[in-house]
Every structure is written in structure tokens, then in C-alpha cells.
């Protein structure tokens, strides 16, 4: 992967806005995922206040450095008006395809027309190459054919080899783009450090079945309604390449051709490791034709699960089912074994120690306690959701025998497993009753878990099954380090 630009600072004149979770109290700024606490100088606090009010970033190195830090941390997001951004003439669309002719035809119909970028279809060893060629010819697009099937990564690379524009948009053949989909993505490239941007993936013409309605509300490809920076271990840790716009200068060797699953996550993580910024932009939407039959849907989820061990081999320690502080882990462990009072005591101790540390940082005891409660106590409560998801997605082969052997663990484990899907149902309000929504979530988690364990056995690794622990929430938490 090619290294990112030498100048990593935000361009002067950029505008940024606060993430909904960001809080500025005096000179203390908190926010991001994982939550960070920054102690600003008086000038820095005034600058952030001005940015939140809509003022542009000045040309000073200090301002541009701070703005970049806030964007990278997820405390702020860019306000983009299109100034300095590339246009459709700067983009070539590459569609990797293997048969699925009706889907390909629908995809090309959505991509072609007056004012649209040129399109290249990369035929990945289709069984009916004449049909793919006919679909490409009917749409008036260029075709490159691979004699042997090499997987979607290899097909994308073959298409990219013919690209001469400074940007390339990869769109899978089972996708249909909406009018105006490209402009919100291209605006991000006014920042020269941005290497890739992806839109939100939404369902295309969902069928009336319960599974289709579940996928419409909770697809594995849908990263949700909140924009953000993409980084391993962050709130948005990966992007699917069902649709992805990439700066050609950042493409480097491209997608890995020796893996058939997880090549999209691997590509995005290598981009980030090389110094490029990757963004998720839900203001642009691309429709995906989801699987709505149970067997292929289960098989696809299982296939996704096998990618974790493959990615672990390429990005050590980057794939974990659960990220937790040791204080939070101790509190939940105490509660799980029937000692909730002990768990509350652990959380209270962590909060008090953190408040003591933050008092020295902020010089304000009341503010320190508010922050400590949010970071330590609030973080412990919020951990219920990812903990329950980790049990159903990774640890159920151990959790079920444990619940059978230790009856008092049955209710806590069941509550933890059911909490995430029920909370998601309440948040999403899908066109599906809670029982079937929960059933769909748990069935998908089991499918993913089967693939996860299969991949770990093949790769002979346990790391994708192990939680990542830290001292977060303690007085020495990285989240509590001060920065001026």
C-alpha cells in the first residue's frame, strides 16, 4: 500500500463540527470511540468553540494539527460543501462480476447515463462470458475478462489496471446505485489525506418474507446512520466494499488476491496503516440485493465469520470479539456469579480513582466526578451490549455448557444475550415483531460463530476468540491522558 501524503494536516479553510457525543467543558474536551479526554490550552478551547460555531480552520499549524486530531478521534466530523472536491469526470467505476446477469444488468443501468463516469466491468471467470459481454455491450461500457475465477479482489485489481482517472469507484454487481450517490463521497477527497470513502449499504426492493425484513433493518453490510472515521477497534472498524471510492494514488498493490473472504477489511486496514484516512458517509446510499432465503443467508454469515482468523494472520491482535477494561470485566464477572454488590463496588472504586486523577487534570472536583462517572460507571453499564453480542457471536459454545453446569448463571447469560437484539429492535423499530427480530439476530450470530470457530481451527489461532483488555477507566487509562 502506498504511504499517505507527507502533509497529514487538515487543509486551511476546512470546517468541522462536533460529534453528537462530544462534550466541551471549559478546557476539557471528551468524546470519540473509544472515549478520549483532551485537556486543551485556553487558546485551543476558544478555537474548538469557534469551530463548533462554524468558523473555518485557520492556516496555523497548531489549528490544523488539532483539527486533524479531533477528526481522527471521532470527536469531530468534516463539514463539506464540495469546494475543492473532484467531480464525476475524475472517476472510473469498476464492477467486478461473475454471472448473475439480471443483477449485473440492473447495476449497469443505474451506473450509466448522461453525465455519469465511465464504467469497466471486470468479468471474473464467468460460466457465461458471452452473457456478461452482452450486458456490458448493451450498457456501452468497457469489459475486461479474467479467464479464471480469482475472487472479487482479483477482479477489482484487473479493472483498476485499466483506470486512468485519479479516483476509482468499486461497485459490486449485486448493487444498484441511487441518483446522486457519488457527489457526497467525492466531497471527502477535498482532504488530501483521505484515501477511501464508502456509502451506506441499504436493501434493494426487499421481499415480504420475515428474513428479508430482518435484513432490511439489520444487514451485516449496513454500517448505520452515523458518519465517522474508520479504524480497527473504533466505532466503525471496517467497511464492506460492496461500494467504495478510492483515491488511485492510495491503491498501491490493491486487494489481496490470495484470500477469498475479508479482502475488503484487509484493504481498508492496510490503507489506514499506510497513513490514509478512511471515512464512512451515510449521506450516500447504495442498494444491495440481500439474500432472502435462509440457507444461502446462513451460509453467507458463516462465510463472513471465517474471515476473522484470516485477518488475524495479516493484522495481529486487530480482530477481537470484545474490547473491555479490566475494571469493567471484573464488575461484570462479579455480577455474573451472583455478586452484583461486589460488581457495583468495583465500579464505584474505579469511578473514585478516576475522579481523583481527573481532579488533578481539570482542577475542578465537580467536573472531575461528572467525567469519571461518565467514563467509568457509564462505560461499565454500556458494556452490556457488546458483551452480550460477544457471547452470542463468539462464546456460545462455551457459554451453553457453562449454563448447563452452573444453574445460577443461566438467567444472567440469557439476559446478556437477549439485551443487544432487544435494544436494537427498540432503536430501529423494524417492520418485524421483537420475537422474529431476536430470532434473526441470534441465528445470524450462530452462523457467524460457526465460521469464526472454523477459521480459528484452520488458522490455529485463538486470538479472534479472546477479549482485548486494558486499564481503561482506571487512573492510568489511555482515555484519560491529557493533551494540550
Describe the residue ranges of each PLM region.
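N-proximal low-complexity "stem/linker" segments adjacent to membrane-targeting elements
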Residues: 2-12, 16, 20-40, 46-110
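Conserved donor NDP-sugar-binding/catalytic core segment of glycosyltransferases
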Residues: 179-213, 289
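Acidic donor-binding segment of Leloir-type glycosyltransferases
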Residues: 108-145
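Active-site-adjacent helix/loop segment of glycosyltransferases
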Residues: 281-282, 287-344, 360-444, 450-454, ...
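Short aromatic/hydrophobic "clamp" motif used to bind/position activated sugar donors
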Residues: 168
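Short, flexible, basic/aromatic active-site loop/helix in glycosyltransferases
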Residues: 199, 215-236
Amino acid at each position: 500500500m502506498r504511504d499517505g501524503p507527507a502533509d497529514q494536516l487538515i487543509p486551511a479553510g476546512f470546517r468541522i463540527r462536533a460529534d453528537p457525543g462530544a462534550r466541551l467543558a471549559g478546557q476539557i474536551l471528551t468524546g470519540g470511540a473509544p472515549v478520549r479526554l483532551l485537556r486543551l490550552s485556553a487558546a485551543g478551547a476558544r478555537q474548538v468553540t469557534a469551530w463548533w460555531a462554524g468558523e473555518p480552520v485557520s492556516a496555523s499549524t497548531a489549528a490544523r494539527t488539532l483539527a486533524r486530531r479531533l477528526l481522527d478521534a471521532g470527536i469531530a466530523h468534516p463539514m463539506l460543501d464540495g469546494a475543492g472536491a473532484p467531480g464525476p469526470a475524475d472517476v472510473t467505476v469498476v464492477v467486478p462480476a461473475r454471472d448473475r446477469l439480471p443483477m449485473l444488468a440492473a447495476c449497469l443501468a443505474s451506473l450509466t447515463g448522461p453525465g455519469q463516469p465511465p464504467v469497466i466491468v471486470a468479468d471474473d471467470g464467468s460460466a457465461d462470458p458471452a452473457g456478461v459481454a452482452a450486458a456490458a455491450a448493451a450498457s456501452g461500457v468497457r469489459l475486461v475478462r479474467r479467464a479464471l475465477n480469482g475472487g472479487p479482489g482479483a477482479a477489482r485489481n484487473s479493472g483498476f489496471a485499466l483506470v486512468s482517472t485519479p479516483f476509482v469507484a468499486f461497485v459490486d454487481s449485486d448493487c444498484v446505485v441511487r441518483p446522486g450517490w457519488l457527489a457526497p463521497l467525492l466531497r471527502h477527497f477535498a482532504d488530501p489525506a483521505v484515501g477511501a470513502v464508502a456509502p451506506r449499504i441499504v436493501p434493494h426492493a426487499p421481499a415480504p418474507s420475515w428474513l428479508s425484513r430482518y435484513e432490511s433493518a439489520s444487514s451485516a453490510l449496513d454500517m448505520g446512520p452515523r458518519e465517522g472515521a474508520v479504524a480497527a477497534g473504533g466505532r466503525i472498524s471496517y467497511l464492506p466494499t460492496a461500494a467504495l471510492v478510492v483515491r488511485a494514488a492510495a491503491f498501491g498493490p490493491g486487494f489481496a488476491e490470495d484470500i477469498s473472504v475479508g479482502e475488503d477489511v484487509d484493504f481498508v486496514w492496510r490503507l489506514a496503516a499506510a497513513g490514509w484516512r478512511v471515512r464512512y458517509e451515510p449521506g450516500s446510499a447504495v442498494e444491495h440485493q440481500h439474500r432472502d432465503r435462509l440457507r444461502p443467508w446462513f451460509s453467507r454469515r458463516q462465510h463472513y465469520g471465517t474471515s476473522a482468523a484470516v485477518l488475524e494472520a495479516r493484522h495481529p491482535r486487530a480482530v477481537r470479539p470484545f474490547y473491555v477494561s479490566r475494571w469493567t470485566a471484573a464488575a461484570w464477572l462479579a455480577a455474573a456469579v451472583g455478586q452484583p454488590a461486589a460488581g457495583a463496588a468495583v465500579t464505584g472504586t474505579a469511578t473514585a480513582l478516576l475522579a481523583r486523577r481527573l481532579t488533578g487534570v481539570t482542577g475542578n472536583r465537580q467536573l472531575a466526578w461528572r467525567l469519571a462517572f461518565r467514563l467509568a460507571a457509564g462505560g461499565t453499564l454500556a458494556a452490556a451490549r457488546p458483551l452480550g453480542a460477544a457471547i452470542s457471536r463468539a462464546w456460545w459454545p462455551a457459554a451453553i455448557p457453562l449454563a448447563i453446569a452452573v444453574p445460577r448463571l443461566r438467567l444472567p447469560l440469557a439476559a446478556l444475550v437477549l439485551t443487544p437484539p432487544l435494544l436494537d429492535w427498540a432503536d430501529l423499530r423494524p417492520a418485524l415483531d421483537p420475537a422474529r427480530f431476536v430470532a434473526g439476530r441470534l441465528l445470524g450470530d450462530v452462523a457467524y460463530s460457526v465460521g469464526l470457530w472454523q477459521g480459528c481451527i484452520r488458522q490455529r489461532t485463538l486470538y479472534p476468540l479472546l477479549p482485548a483488555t486494558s486499564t481503561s477507566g482506571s487512573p492510568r487509562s489511555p482515555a484519560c491522558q491529557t493533551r494540550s
